[in-house]
Structure formats: C-alpha cells, structure tokens
Amino acid sequence: MEVLMAERADLVYHNKAIDGTAMKRLISRLIDHFGMAYTSHILDQVKTLGFRQATATSISLGIDDLLTIPSKGWLVQDAEQQSFILEKHHSYGNVHAVEKLRQSIEIWYATSEYLRQEMNPNFRMTDPSNPVHIMSFSGARGNASQVHQLVGMRGLMSDPQGQMIDLPIQSNLREGLSLTEYIISCYGARKGVVDTAVRTSDAGYLTRRLVEVVQHIVVRRTDCGTIRGISVQPRNGMTERMFFQTLIGRVLADDVYIGLRCIAARNQDIGIGLVNRFITFRAQPVYIRTPFTCRSTSWICQLCYGRSPTHGDLVELGEAVGIIAGQSIGEPGTQLTLRTFHTGGVFTGGTAEHVRAPSNGKIKFNEELVHPTRTRHGHPAFLCSIDLYVTVEGRDIIHNVNIPPKSLILVQNDQYVESEQVIAEIRAGTSTFNFKERVQKHIYSESAGEMHWSTDVYHAPEYTYGNVHLLPKTSHLWILSGGPYRSSIVSSSLHKDQDQTNAHSFSVERRYISDLSMTNGRVRHKLFSSDLSGKRGDRILDYSRPDQIISKGHWNFIYPSILHENSDFLAKRRKNRFIIPFQYDQEGEKELIPHSGISIEIPINGMLRRNSILAYFDDTRYRRSSSGITKYGTVEIDSIVKKEDFIEYRGTKEFSSKYQMKVDRFFFIPEEVHILPGSSSIMVRNNSLIGVDTRITLNIRSRVGGLVRVERKKKNIELKIVSGDIHFPGETDKISRHSGILIPPGTEKKNSKESKTKLKNWIYVQRITPTKKKYFVLVRPVATYEIADGINLATLFPQDLLQERDNVQLRVVNYILYGNGKPIRGISHTSIQLVRTCLVLNWDQEQNGSIEGVRASFVEVRANDLIRDFIRIELCKSAILYTGKRKDIAGSGLIHDNVSDRTNINPVYLKDKIPSFIQHQGTVGTLLNRNKECQSLILLSSSNCFRIGPFNGSKYHNVPKESIKEDPIIPIRDSLGLLGTTVPKIANFFYLSYHVITHNHILLTKYLLRDHLKQAFQVLRYCLMDENRRIYNPDPCSNIIFNAFDLNWRFLHHDYSEETSTILSLGQFVCENVCLFKHGPQIKSGQVIIVHVDSFVIRAAKPYLATPGATVHGHYGEILYGGDTLITFIYEKSRSGDITQGLPKVEQVLEVRSIDSISTNLEKRVEGWNEHITKILGIPWGFLIGAELTIAQSRISLVNKIQKVYRSQGVQIHNKHIEIIVRQITSKVLVSEDGMSNVFSPGELIGLLRAERTGRALEEAICYRAILLGITRASLNTQSFISEASFQETARVLAKAALRGRVDWLKGLKENVVLGAMIPVGTGFKALVHRSRKPNNIHLEIKKNNLFEGQVGDDILFYHRELFGSCGPNNFHDTSEQSFMKFHDS
C-alpha cells in the first residue's frame, strides 16, 4: 500500500474529456504498469462511474437532434453547377464519357468529404451537448460515416458489381430520400448485405485452414539455443510506430552495443523503455529472435516467441501459440468485411494533391521542359518529366515553387494567378496499396446515322479482317444524321445511287425472291430487270461455281457495276469488301481467256493502300480437289511485305500470309482427310493399311488406299489416308535416315534386296513409328507444279492497264495461297486454289510521300452507241481512267433512253410507299451494311440538315482557286442540277475537278485538342462546277448525296463579314458553340455539305471524343443504328481499397497462387534463387545454403505482403502470428532427383531441418530445393494423418496412410481431440508429465535434475533426440522467471 501511495504522488493530474482512442491508450498503459488483475479493478470503477453519469444525464435521441449542416445547400448547388458544365462540354465533344464519369464522381466525392469534415465543427459550435455528437464522437456508438449519412449527404453508392453509380444521393436520411435515391440506396444496401455474408464465410474458412496448419505448434521449452536472428533497424521508410511494433515483446538474439558499452544483453526481452533507448542512441541494427530462427522442428521455444500479447510477459510453457496465431489472422477478416459497407466502395485515392500559388502574381516556368497533355478529366495541362522550378512574381516579392516530376501543371506560362489558386497537381504516389484494374467502357450511339472520323485509324492486329480499329491519337468520331431504312428483301430499284427522287416516283412492284441462301459466307443475289418486251424473266439458276457470272443473250461487254437484261449476278461478300467477278463471252474472236474469269476486288469504301490487290485471277491449272500439303522444298521464300504494310487500313487486303515465289516450282503432296465428330465410331485402326473404297465410318468410304492416321483433337477426330509405298528400312538405307524431306528424281533408291532403281518422279519421305522400337518409312507421291510466268498478260488484263501512269504501277504477282508445310483441308466437294495471279497496285513512295491511299470506283459513261466502263483509280492528285472498249452489238438506242433502268450493285428495295418519302422529297443513298442479308439505304430528309446564310454581298472566296485544274473533258450523263432545276446543257459537259480539302482543326473554344492541331487531313472531294462557278459536292466518299430538299431549310441570316468569318470548306465539321459569325455561336454541330454564295447547309452530326488507344467499332461511312456500340475505352481506375481486395489477397498470398498479374509470383522467385545459388556453390553446399537463403528471403517478403494488406485496412496484427504461419508453409523442402540417396525418394516433401540433419548423419549430399506450400497443401503434409484426414480428402488420406503403414505419434492437438485423448498443451502440462515420471528415476542425483527433466520430456513427446549443452544449470533461464525480472523494463 505504501508503494501505491508513493507512486500516486508521482502521477500527473489530467483534466480533460476522454474519448475512445484515449481510453484505449490509457488501458494499455495501465496493463503495462500494474498488470492485468489490478487494471481490471480500475476499469470496473470507470464502468460504474460511466453508468452513473449516463443515468443522471438520461441521454435520449429524437429526430430533432439530427441537425443538418447549414453549408450543405450551396455546396450541393455548386457541385450541380460543375456537373452541368461538364455535361455541356461532353455534348460539345470536348471530354469523352470516361473523363466525364471520372470527373463527376470526383466532384461529388469531394463535396461529400467536405460535408463530413464540416460536421464535427458544426456540432461543436451550434450544440456541443447534442446526443448524436456526444455518442458518435466519444466512440460510444456509431462512427463518423453513419452520422454523416444521417445529417450530411449519403453521397455516391456502388451497384452490386461494385461499380460507382455516378448519380449521387444528395439527401441525407434526416431529410428523406426521393424515389430514385431510394432505389439507388437499395442497391448499395444490397451490396453491403451480400458482401457481409460472403466475406464472413470466407474469413471463417480462412481461419479454419490457418488453424489447421499450425495447430500442433506449442511452446515446449525455454530455449532452443539458436544463435541466429533477423536484424531490425529504423530504415527511412519505417515509421517509429512500426519500429516499436516490430521490436516490443521480442527477445534479443545478440548483445546491443553503443561504442564499447553494452546496453542490452542477449536473451533479454524488449520493453518500451529499451526501444526508446535504441531510438535515442541510434543503435546499430538490433538482432531479434523470431519463430523463423527457432531450431525446434515441430514446436517453438519461449525465447523465440517472446512476450505473449495478452499479458505482456514472456509466453508460458505449454501455451498453444499456433492456434492463437491462426485465429489472430483469420478473425480480422470478419471485421474487415463490415468495414467495406461503410465506405460503400467510393473512389479512394482518386483525388491528387494540389500545389497552390503562394501569392498573387505572374507565373513563369521553362516551357521547354514541359509538353502538353490532357488530364484524366480532359482538361489541357502540361506534363513535366523532371523537377520544375516555377516562380510567381508578385508586386514586391518573388516566390519559388518546386514541382516534382510527373506532375501536371494546370496554368500557362506568363499567366496571372491569384493566391491559393491551384497551379499544379502532384500525381498520387503509387505506394498506396490499391490495385489498378483495367476497365472497359462502351460508348453507344445515341442516334442513327453514318459514321465518320477525322484521323487515321489502325486495325488491331488480332482483328485483321474485322471492323475493330485502334485510334493512334486524340480525335473526334462523328455520327452524321440520316434516317436509315433497312430492307430485308433484296430487290431491284430503278433509281441509281445519288439520284434525286420525288416521293411519288417510286413505283416499285413487290417482288419476293425465293432463295436468298448463304453459302460459304457469300450471299447470292438474284436480280431481275425488265425485258425489252416488258415481260418479267424470273429465272433462278443453279450456280455450279461461285466465281462465275452466267451471261445469256448477246451482251458482250464487261459491266461490273450495272447488270443488264436477264443476266444473273452473284456478288461475293468477303467480310468488308465486295468482289465483282466477270468474264467475257467472246463469240467472234478466240482469245485465250480462261474459264474462271477475273475478279476485281475493291473495298466497300473504295480506299486502296500501297501493295493492295486490285484484281485477281484463279488459274484452273493450280486447282486441286483433294486435301494435302504444299511444300516449297529448299526454295527460299521472300515475303513481299515490308514492315509498314502490315497495318491493314480500313479493310483492304493484307499479305502477311501470302508469299511470293522466287523459284518457279512448288510441290503438292496429296492426302485424303476426313474430319469426323468426336463421337463417331471409326471402323479402321490407326497405322493400318486399307484399300480403295474401304468403309471408314458408317457412311464414309475411302477414295484412295493407303495408310490410316487417326488424330484425336478436342472436339473432333481427324482421319488421314496417306497413299504411298511402305518401306521397311535396311541397315544401309539412306532414305530411311531422313524424315519429312523431298527427294528429286534421279536419286538412287535402294530396296532391301540391294537392287538399285532410279526414281522417276519426286517423292516425299515420311518416317512413321507406330511403336517405340519399330518404325517404317512411307514414300509418298508428289505432284509438282511449275509457276509459269508465261501467261500472256495482255490476254488477262487489258494492255493499257499495265502502263505506268502518274507513278502508279500495276504489277502481276503470283501468290501461293498456303504457307510452307501447312496442311490444306478441303471441305467436301470444293476445289482448292493453290496459286492466285494478282494485279498489285503500287506507287512511288518518295515522290508522293503524303499519299495514304487511292480511291477506286466504277464509272460508266455512254456516248451514242459506245458504252465505256472505267475502273477509276485516283491518287489524291490525279485520275487514271481505264476503259475496256466493247462494241455494243445490238443497237442500244432503245434501252438506254432511260438511264435509270440500270440497277446498282447494292440494290435498294423499297416498300410500296414509305412514309418518309411521302411527306417530302428525300435522297436515296445505298450503303453496304454489316448485316449480310440486309441492304441498307439511308434517306436524308430536310430535318437532318439546316442551312446557314445567305451572306449578302460577299465574294465567294473560300475555295483555293489554284487547286482546281481541269481534267480532260469527260461526258457524264444528264442529271438534275443541285437545286432540282436542270442545269443548262453546254453540250452535255461538266468540268470534273478535284479539290483537296484540308480539315481546319475543329474549332473549339476552351479545350485543347492535342495531336491534331497542325496536321492537315486530306480528303478527296469532287466539286462539280457548273458554268456559274458554283461549287457542289456530290461526295462519293460516303455513297450518299445530299441534295436540295424542299425548302424547309433553316435560313439563319447573318451579316457575313470577311474579317470575323472562318473560312468554311466543304466537308468541314463544325462543333456546337463555336462562333462562326459575329452574331453568336453555332447552334448545332454538324458537317458543311453545301456552300452557296450566300449561305451554306450543315448536316446535323454528333461528335464523340476518343483518346488514343480507344477501339472504334464499325467502318468509315458505315450506317449505324441507335444503340450500336461506337467506341470502347480502356482505362485504369484504382479499385476501392476495401477488403474486397483484402481477404482474397491474404488468401492468395497464403495459398501461394497468383490470381492477379500484379502480385509478383513468389514461387518463380523462389525457384530462381534456388538455381543461382546451386550454380555458384556446387552441389552439397549449394543445396544447403540455397535452400536456407531462399527460405529466409521468401519468408520475409511473405510476411511483409500480408502485413501490407492488413495495415491498409487499419488492422494491427503482431508480426509473430504471421511469422508462425509463414514458417509452416515454408519449412518443407522437395527432394530432387539429382543425388539419389537411399533415405528419401525423389519428390518427397521433408522438413528442412530434418534434411540437414540426415545429410550430416549420412555424410552424403542430399539434393533438395526449397518449395512454397500453400496453407491447404501444408495442412495435407503434416506428420499426423489423423489431422490431415479430418481436414479434407478423408478417404484418400486414410487409404494412403494405410498403404504406407504410417504411424501417427499423436503429437498435435487435433489428433488427440479426434481420438478423445488428453491434448498435450496447457500451462500445467509439463508438471503433469514430470510427476508421472519421477518415481522411476528417484535414484539419480538431484543436481542433474534439470538436464534430466528436459531430456525425458523431449523423449516422451518427440522422437527427435537432441542434446543441448545450454540446457545445463549455467543457463540464463535456469530458474523460473524471477531471475529475469531484473531485466524487465517497466
């Protein structure tokens, strides 16, 4: 009592309110100072005091006590204003959807956080004794987050997938929620409930596995005598708190010196005082003992464990520390689950630190060190790659601000900034423990229309023929409006593409086509057109070969784009290009025109790049009907493709798989192949010989005889029949040594009878080994093909095609369609084309460096009786016209009076009356659609366009005159003028001219569109000029013509003055809100389609911004419908750092599997360490040291990983617990096959210490390597089969144990519990064992007592015998803990 009085005199008197955290601190100090029992008395008094006070106060809680925060109104209003501005920018096309989502979430998150911080001061000022305030902030009930939901705002919620819903709940629970908010909050609540349930079960299972691994670990003895330890020193990254946590309660493994003075001795445990001393004296690294270094195999000693966390004293002997460790790690899992629900998965770590200006002034920095970029909200900013010094010049003072690298500078050089204005944003450090995950976000089209983009787009390599494009730089995607009309029945229409029509002129009969079949991805169109006599010829022909046009009657000219009377027409659609096959029927002249005909191949949008194939021709000589393999022998293959041509450009062909032949011969090895479903029964055996017409399955018979090879694939069976001679090799046979080679004729072939014969033909030798010992050689016949360059090209392609014009060359190239050694599979009854002769388009890159591609289109021109067909190929600067002249034998005067009875390639089918046509005039345009069976046509009605103008009294000055050069005059058919009046015929001539348009960079007000400010974009436009020099644009780029509709144009009259006006060019895209004229901003965004002297017409369009790396779906000029996917963004976001990551992450580390690419794969690292050290040190030492080092390394990194997860959640777990578990999963080694010792079999898992001891005892190297077991595997590899069987796989474990005759020594807890025996733990256990043993051993001398006891105890419990000299009476801990008290540091 006197002691207490004396101490009480020293105590400091505190007078302040105490909350939850202070209470925790107080209790821990009390336990340290007075011990457990005394503290519990004190706490009892605190409890009674608390209840007495609460009774007197009688706190109650009513709804009026929930005071809302006064500043909430304008905060919410401000956030709404910001998100409204954001919405506007999105509709102008300045930010894209992902940036918008990100920014709106951050706006609301910041608002909600600000309100949460306001909450406490608000209560303190207005009503400090408010019950809600007292309860939550004292830590009695409720936390800040819950109170915030009651009186602040509920904020952002997440949907069941864990994604944020970007509509925040603005009300709090006191005000009540609107209907929408109620539904959203139900989402969040449901996620919380589901999460809690799932995580609780997960945490429970984790605990079960952990306990299973370490259940047998008990403190068995005082000291194992190890001299090793791990070093701890306060590194720069380690906070003082972490240093404290690591050291307190451990035992020193070595003396600690400062200079020559020893301040702490070995085997002394560390208290707070000692740690403070280490910190103040800056001691050298402190070596501590950990469970890792304990030398006991299957238990642990007192000193390696250290203090027990429960009572702050050295752990007692017999305590089951393993189970405590397992539960300490598993249990927080359940708490963590509940924690997720409160944060609701809000974007954490999304807000970055800001640098603010220190005072008003001008800001200056070196502009060469920064480069422009976009922030993640889409704002323009500068990125600095190194440290940047920024000076702010005020009136009387100059401030220097240092900005770290990788930061974003949000102001411009020489800009005036105000004090506290944000001038830079520092990237949030990546050290925070949150994963980045890559998320895809799809953007859908809001309206129907036609797609355009204003930059180059590359194909993603894996979708070479698909319609997935990658954007290389920031640009806009435009959806040009137009009402699409989809027709599912293909029919003919009398109107050509780009005709202007009147709604009532459509008199199309309904004609249904019976057979619209799809074969091999090709669509057959059967077209009918009018007979001379007016009858309908409705014949349906069967096509024998898909590449052929069957032409009857007397039409002899090639007409690729127009079909005439009675001719049936078949277009092959290959992914995204159409191929028009055609052939001549020459009756008069006998020309060498092969039967198969030439196919001209032009992509849908008509753009061809360099090395594109313009036309090809399949020679029948290289056609095979059977499957087989092509070989080029020793021929060198030269790929004609340079690297730059690998990028396929908007659907033209690419040649990565096509090879050009250097040598003019290749070989084809025939074989018969049947691909059968996996379930079918085969009637022949593998490697058996069959004759011709043998039955293979129930309904298939072989066409050739030979050897049968059966190969089973995943879903089907591949059965080959290989014809050829079987040849059993003799000793001296040369052929048999090789396999898979071609042998030329003239080689001597030895038979087994030693008679020599010379080969007549090429043969192919293949070695077949049915069993391991036997093998034979199959000699297979080979078909040899010579590729003749001698095909007279003039007969294939018209001669004037092959002359060079304007740097465009056309080369004839033969391609082999299949790679060397590739097996070719023919589908039943189709022929395989081996070689294709192609016409390849090329031009000089040097002279025309800017030319991206050429445009190909078909043109038809009629003059008197001569019909000319052109394939027009234009570079951006010139037109090359190819005519195929064919005389029209039957005078064509009758037919061609009305031009419109020719049908187009992609015909239009219209219903009897389409509502949109009846209302007003429209324009028909056809486009090939993605959908193969449907044609699309787009109707532009006046509602899609609006007109701006007229401008009075201005000269037309925005067409660069010099770019218009007149080409040779080309007769073009009569056509309606643009405004519906017929243009005066000046001998029927138009001037056809080209006008290269550079896209003015899209005019934007605020946002910087990086990447394409300076690059001009060249689009080929045709401007037709009549004699008044007006310019019209029939824009063949899109297959749509925009004509004058009836006059519901919007006339927006503006005084058009040259100074303020922007020069408009045809086809230019104009964004919304851009000032074109003095009178105010543009009302809608769109594309300029018609420019008049006094006005212009804009076709409405919606811009979508896309950043580099985004994927664009669909093709340039394709018709899209509302709701189609336009763009897919891939962006990184930090996952919310709640336990949704925590628990699985811990589990993943403990089970040693890498679910996630982010977590470094520990197993690989472990194997790497193993190999290197073994290589350096040689065999016996290498294994010993290698395994040791590996295990030490991996243990430390595992502990750090697990701690990281828990710390990020704010859960404190002592390292000891984790170490015990990690020790168990890393303590095994795998015996390798290198040294076959007679003790362990290779592949056996044994303890590391046992391996080392056995190695010492045998004096022979055992080769082993360290291995990481997961906790499940570790539980199934213990010394007790009873505990394994009670964990998992009971039958398997028991059966194995019975077969091996395993003995269970019942050393752990679980085995004893299962058998109902007494468990070998508990602090009284040691005394019990010794009492039962003492009577037998009385005659021994008493002074040896200690040594004897320790040894007997070991012997009974464990079959490992180990003598330690340190167990004698001279041990530091020879008596009980009292002698130790002098080192106890209170």
Curated annotation (Swiss-Prot):
Its EC number is 2.7.7.6. Disulfide bonds: none annotated. One of its GO terms (cellular component) is mitochondrion. The keyword rRNA processing does not apply. It is an enzyme of class 2 (transferase). InterPro entries: DNA-dir_RpoC2_beta_pp, RNA_pol_beta''_euk, RNA_pol_Rpb1_3_sf, RNA_pol_Rpb1_4, RNA_pol_Rpb1_5, Rpb1_funnel_sf. SUPFAM superfamilies: beta and beta-prime subunits of DNA dependent RNA-polymerase. The keyword Transferase applies. GO terms for biological process: DNA-templated transcription. It comes from the Eukaryota. Keywords: Chloroplast, DNA-directed RNA polymerase, Metal-binding, Nucleotidyltransferase, Plastid, Transcription, Transferase, Zinc. Its cofactor is Zn(2+). One of its GO terms (molecular function) is DNA-directed RNA polymerase activity. Its main location: plastid. Zn(2+) binds at residues 224, 294, 301, 304. It is found in: Plastid, Chloroplast. Binds 1 Zn(2+) ion per subunit. It catalyses: RNA(n) + a ribonucleoside 5'-triphosphate = RNA(n+1) + diphosphate. It holds the Pfam family RNA_pol_Rpb1_4. Belongs to the RNA polymerase beta' chain family. RpoC2 subfamily. DNA-dependent RNA polymerase catalyzes the transcription of DNA into RNA using the four ribonucleoside triphosphates as substrates. In plastids the minimal PEP RNA polymerase catalytic core is composed of four subunits: alpha, beta, beta', and beta''. When a (nuclear-encoded) sigma factor is associated with the core the holoenzyme is formed, which can initiate transcription. This is DNA-directed RNA polymerase subunit beta''. It comes from Acorus calamus. The lineage of its organism: Eukaryota, Viridiplantae, Streptophyta, Embryophyta, Tracheophyta. The gene is rpoC2.
